[in-house]
Curated annotation (Swiss-Prot):
This is Cytosolic carboxypeptidase 1. Residues 366-398, 1181-1225 are annotated as: Disordered. It holds the Pfam family Pepdidase_M14_N. The lineage of its organism: Eukaryota, Metazoa, Chordata, Craniata, Vertebrata. One of its GO terms (cellular component) is cytoplasm.
Length: 1225
């Protein structure tokens, strides 16, 4: 106890002592005329001793409210005694050395930097200057400088720059003095004006004298000199001076010296400093040339290879990589033009816009690369992978609409009512009287018990439908338990139980000639799997040599085969018995897929492959072929890709986000750099080229063969770089010169056990989910024949990075110096001579949609479901744009039931305006399947709404393999404000449907446009809100007090509760200026739909909820489409609980289903489990969005339209009872 008391007394004594000393100094400062030099020297020495030995003294001097710093600085400013000055400088050094940040800021705020610079100026006037004073003073300035934003300006204005530089010049042999001087200069060089000033006064030459030649002495001085030099060389004037004096070669030689001698890696910072100097010099064109001429590429490449084994040397390898990539000569993309390889003549040429600009260029203009892409304005940081992703976009806050008058929705038809009457025929449900229909009333009797509501997803069980194929898949693929096997979903539709042999195809394509004859080129069959081709036959042709059966081995001569489009041909085991096409047997290079000869197992597989009706109820290969025949493409495709013909079954296994190994991107970049260093190792052979159809495939065994001449295919050119490495170039959208993202192509002729590297080298976006766990998709024909007919994620060593191919300013909006990006992935194929397909995402073609719609129409129950499919309009390419109407048939043809039928609110859905966003079609498929389902939930939904659906807004873009545009070369989702009936017919007429509904006072309750998002994870929505838009701007508070219904958030919040992939935290309801012409904003603003949304589905995967860390698949996308429907049913409860007269028991059962999430047990059967808790989504690495931005928005109170916040957690039945009780009272 006595010890504690003594310590306390000692602390009090110290505090009293420092206060006393400061009081003495303050008194001396007040009596400046009677300045006592000896006393001041004594007091400052005592303070220095206490500050040096006692932390509490330092705290007391800098504590809040203390005047210690002011007293010390005042004394420094007033005294002329050298020892007193040194004492005070030492005191300030002690204060700045410990807990430096806060105390240094305190010194700066009290004017410390200004006083010290004045002291430096006065001290420099003495001759000779005091060395100790200069060392201490510069040391203190070097500590204050980095914390003072205006230090560089203060130093230049006060004249301190010249003083410090002259000290260095005059004392090159005095490392102790010039070290703090260089530290001050290093800080001053952060100011570009200071850098230029110092360069003019010989600073660059002085620093090169210090850093060379190689020596191990004074390494600290060398390090600071290199840092200062690197800062100086950021000035282009200084960089040019360094190049003119051949300092680039000096730096490279010095770096090699340190690399050879620093074997223990103790001086890595010096080596990095040299690289930073090279990095600064190579910002200019002559610097890059000097670096290449000095053999810098090879030097840094070799040293980097030697450093890669040591993890601690990664900073050296990374900086070397940046320098080499910057100096790598900009290459021309090996294309004759960046315009699409396919041309389509528009009905008329627009007078303005990108298409007009594209075709106004003289033919002699080279649009692939600019005349001088290697300009001198290159910034060092532009080559870094952390490049600002929004540098070429307008600022987010500037993009937000601030004019409230433009935000207020108003129903602006824009067309006369007479003009809109043309759309009356698309709404037969509003005039149908059902007198000629044989309707059976399903009205429940009072007290009757209804059956349970089946799981609210896209399907319903029908155990009697055979499912042998799914069981076999389970046993073969992932050993699914018998319990899980029994839960697999049969079709939910009223399907025929007659199974036909539609899976006997061992081939990948059917070939159909215009004249109706079919030829078998046995060499193609044996080597490649005979291609599926399309014939438009007329009449029967005699079969000269007969058809090749599945068991016959074809010879090497073409065999014409009898064709008929209406009747079957007499070819046993033919897959196309009802159509004018034929397939040969699978036999790759004379070798069976896995065995030397056909085995009983192969025959068993073939038998099992025929039972596809049970798992793909909407897929019919024969029907697909018939539809493709009538699909019009610009390239006039005559082939069908195997996956589209045969169909896709979601795999049983989960596909996790890929974890990228450390250093894989760096390794790929170095391999690219090797192309310049070792050019003789590069094959550079074109093996596929749409621009040169005569470029035939090479016959060498070791060369892969490529093809994309089928619906939705996109691959323009392939160049073999090394034996197992290929550069791939994507085709631009038709009538455009960019939009390279979607790919879909075929590869064949591979070997097993070989790692093939594929580089797609003309990507445009500055980042991609391929860097964050996403993998491309592959479909293997041999895997499909082994009962695994699915797309699955493949690829290792995947990364996305900037490459050395220049982008023309004609494709970048006038910006020069842009580069393309590379997607690279490595694949080892499991089967020799397989035929595989690669895609950016799960393909979903226009013909697939037409097939699904026809199957839905033929399989639905007409007594329960009102289904109409009509052609809204014809596209530019001559393809029909379907529009679908789905609702429940009226209970009877009595007036009351028909009246209720006609007055159901509308739900308007659209999808696939961007062709590359194929996931939108899979979500739409889930929605359509659910709406056509036979469950009680689906029936309730149909009885609640009339669904008007345009499932594919851009058929031409989908057919022709575009990523974003239609044949007009424009983004259709930017044409909604003023669509042109000739150039944008699908948008014009879809908007016309909405305008018609608005004109007859039947504005839809919900509008939703399905999209895909390539840069973010999860599924989320963008909506429209005036209040939230204004809240994100700097508008005054008065404008934020506006009253706005919060019903726009109801549906997203419901989906957040029931859909595992949905993330409310990613949703945004801000209206941006750049999105004012999109469907979401136009329908909200002009049609007056408050709940107008864009629903974005990730192309990658999820980072929250049940699917966290998993890549998304078609079953999750279809589930999302079904969940959207369930959310609409919940929306009905929340907004109009009295309108839907379901018994409370039925509402309670459905509420239990809605408040849980789905667990997928088979490709199409969903089983319920407890919902996952919400996860707060981390800030996404990219704010870019093709359709909308994604700011973080706090959830506002009162989002639901019900009267109190507590109702968010109510069940549907509770809400209903609450409203009923409220009305009864």
């Amino acid at each position: 106890m006595s010890k504690v008391k003594a310590t306390a007394e000692k602390c009090q004594l110290n505090i009293s002592r420092i206060q006393s000393l400061l009081s003495q100094l303050e008194k001396v400062n007040a009596e400046s005329l009677l300045f006592d030099t000896d006393n001041t020297r004594y007091v400052t020495a005592k303070i220095f001793h206490l500050a040096q030995t006692q932390e509490k003294t330092r705290k007391e001097m800098t504590a809040k409210g203390s005047t210690g710093i002011e007293v010390i600085l005042c004394t420094l400013e007033n005294t002329r005694d050298l020892q007193t000055i040194l004492n005070i400088l030492n005191i300030l050094n002690e204060l700045a050395s410990t807990a430096g940040g806060r105390r240094i800021n305190a010194l700066i705020s009290k004017g410390g930097a200004r006083i010290l610079l004045q002291l430096l100026l006065s001290a420099s006037k003495e001759s000779p200057s005091n060395e100790e004073l200069m060392i201490v003073l510069h040391s203190l300035l070097a500590k204050l400088g980095p914390k003072d934003k205006k230090f560089g300006v203060k130093a230049r204005v006060s004249g301190a720059l010249n003083i410090s530089l002259n000290l260095v010049k005059q004392n090159l042999q005095n490392p102790r003095l010039i070290l703090p001087c260089l530290q001050v200069l290093r800080v001053c060089c952060m100011n570009s004006v200071n850098s230029a000033y110092l360069g003019k006064n010989g600073a660059v030459e002085i620093l090169f004298k210090i850093i060379g030649p190689f020596t191990r002495r004074n390494t600290g001085l060398i390090k600071v000199s290199l840092d200062t030099l690197a800062a100086l060389l950021k000035s282009r004037t200084n960089a040019r001076k360094a190049v003119d004096r051949a300092y680039v070669q000096t730096l490279i030689s010095t770096y090699m010296d340190w690399h050879r001698h620093d074997t223990r890696h103790r001086h890595m910072l010096i080596r990095k400093g040299i690289l930073q100097c090279l990095k600064s010099i190579t910002n200019i064109k002559i610097g890059r040339k000097a670096f290449i001429d000095a053999n810098g590429m090879k030097t840094l490449y070799n040293t980097s290879q030697e450093c890669q084994a040591v993890r601690t040397l990664d900073p050296l390898v990374n900086t070397s990589s940046l320098i080499m990539r910057k100096c790598f000569p900009k290459n021309r993309l090996p294309l004759p033009t960046i315009k699409s390889a396919f041309q389509f003549q528009l009905p008329f040429m627009p007078t303005s816009g990108p298409v007009a600009l594209l075709y106004s260029m003289p033919p002699e203009v080279d649009d692939v690369v600019d005349e001088s892409d290697d300009n001198e304005d290159t910034d060092a940081e532009t080559e870094a992978e952390a490049e600002n992703e929004d540098s070429d976009q307008i600022c987010k806050n500037d993009d937000i609409e601030t004019d409230i008058t433009k935000l207020i929705p108003g129903q602006e038809l824009g067309r006369t009512l007479e003009d809109l009457k043309m759309y009356e025929r698309f709404f037969p449900e509003l005039t149908e009287d059902f007198q000629e229909f044989d309707l059976v009333s399903n009205e429940p009797k009072p007290g009757a018990k209804l059956g349970p509501i089946i799981v609210p997803t896209a399907g319903e069980e029908q155990p009697e439908v055979p499912n042998n194929f799914m069981k076999n898949l389970a046993r073969r693929s992932c050993n699914i338990s018998l319990e899980d096997e029994s839960n697999q979903r049969p079709t939910f539709l009223d399907m025929s139980k007659n199974v036909t042999n539609k899976g006997n195809s061992l081939d990948q394509k059917v070939h159909v000639d215009k004249d109706g004859s079919c030829y078998y080129y046995s060499n193609d069959i044996v080597r490649d799997l005979e291609k599926l081709s399309l014939h438009k036959a007329s009449g029967n042709h005699p079969c000269r040599n007969g058809c090749v059966s599945a068991k016959d081995k074809p010879n090497f001569l073409p065999h014409p085969c009898n064709k008929s489009t209406s009747s079957s041909i007499s070819c046993s085991n033919s897959l196309f018995e009802k159509h004018s096409m034929h397939l040969g047997p699978l036999c790759c290079s004379g070798i069976a897929p896995d065995d030397d000869e056909s085995s009983p197992l192969d025959e068993q597989v073939m038998r099992e492959m025929t039972d596809f009706d049970s798992i793909l109820p909407l897929h019919d290969p024969d029907l697909y072929i018939e539809i493709v025949k009538n699909t019009k493409s610009v390239p006039e495709y005559t082939e069908v890709a195997y996956p589209d013909y045969f169909g896709h079954v979601p795999p049983f296994f989960k596909e996790r986000l890929l974890e990228r190994p450390y250093g894989v991107q760096r390794s790929k970049i170095f391999q690219d750099i090797e192309r310049m260093i070792h050019p003789n190792d590069i094959i550079d052979r074109v093996i596929y080229d749409l621009d040169n159809p005569s470029c035939s495939a090479h016959d060498e065994i070791d060369i892969l063969k490529f093809n994309s001449k089928f619906e939705s295919g996109n691959l323009r050119k392939v160049i073999q770089i090394r034996k197992n490495e290929y550069d791939l170039i994507l085709n631009s959208d038709i009538n455009s010169n960019h939009y390279h993202q979607w790919f879909y192509f075929e590869v064949s002729g591979m070997r097993t056990g070989v790692a093939y590297r594929f580089n797609i080298i003309n990507c445009e976006k500055s980042n991609s989910q391929f860097n964050y766990g996403m993998q491309p998709l592959m479909y293997s024909v041999q895997e499909a024949l082994a009962s695994r007919p699915w797309w699955y994620r493949v690829g290792t060593d995947i990364c996305y990075y900037k490459n050395h191919f220049s982008r023309s300013s004609l494709a970048t909006g006038g910006q020069k110096g842009k580069s393309y990006y590379t997607i690279t992935f490595t694949v080892t194929f499991p089967h020799k001579d397989d035929v595989c397909y690669f895609a950016y995402h799960y393909p979903y073609t226009y013909s697939t949609l037409k097939m699904h719609l026809q199957k839905l129409e033929s399989l639905h129950s007409p007594q329960q479901i009102y289904f109409r499919q009509e052609v809204l309009c014809e596209t530019l390419g001559g393809n029909g744009c379907p529009v679908i109407t789905i609702t429940a048939m009226p209970e009877s043809n009595y007036y009351e039931h028909v009246y209720q039928f006609r007055n159901r609110p509308y739900i308007f859905l659209t999808s696939r305006v961007h062709p590359g966003e194929t996931n939108a079609s899979w979500v739409m498929k889930g929605t359509l399947e659910f709406l056509m389902g036979s469950s009680a939930t689906a029936q309730s939904l149909r009885e609640s709404y009339i669904f008007k659906i345009v499932p594919m807004l851009n058929p031409d873009g989908v057919i022709n393999g575009n990523h974003r545009c239609s044949l007009s070369g424009e983004d259709l989702n930017r044409q909604w404000q003023n669509p042109n009936s000739d150039l944008h017919p699908t948008i014009y007429h879809t908007k016309g449907l909405l305008q018609y509904l608005s004109a007859i006072k039947r504005v839809p309750l919900v509008y939703c446009d399905y999209h895909g998002h390539s840069r973010k994870k999860n599924v989320f929505m963008y909506g429209c809100s005036i209040k939230e838009t204004v809240w994100h701007t700097n508008a005054n508070a008065a404008s934020c007090d506006m009253v706005e219904e919060s019903g726009y958030k109801t549906l997203p919040k419901v989906l957040n509760q029931i859909a595992p992939a949905f993330s409310m935290s990613s949703c945004s309801f801000v209206v941006e200026k750049s999105k004012e012409s999109t469907a979401r904003v136009v329908v909200w603003k002009e049609i007056g739909v408050q709940r107008s949304y864009t629903m974005e589905s990730t192309l990658c995967g999820c980072d929250q909820g049940k699917y966290k860390d998993l890549q998304i698949g078609t079953k999750e996308l279809e589930e999302m489409g079904a969940k959207f429907c369930v959310g609409l049913l919940r929306l009905k409860r929340l907004t109009s609980p009295m309108e839907l007269t379901l018994p409370p028991s039925l509402i309670d059962i459905e509420n239990e289903l809605i408040e849980s999430s789905c667990k997928v047990a088979s490709p199409t059967t969903y089983v319920l489990e407890d919902d996952e808790p919400r996860f707060i989504e981390e800030v996404d690495y990219s704010a870019e969005s093709n359709d909308d931005v994604d700011p973080d928005l706090p959830e506002n109170i009162g989002d639901f339209e019900t009267s109190t916040l507590e109702e968010e957690s109510f069940s549907d039945s509770e809400i209903t009872r609450t409203h009923m009780s409220g009305q009864s009272t």
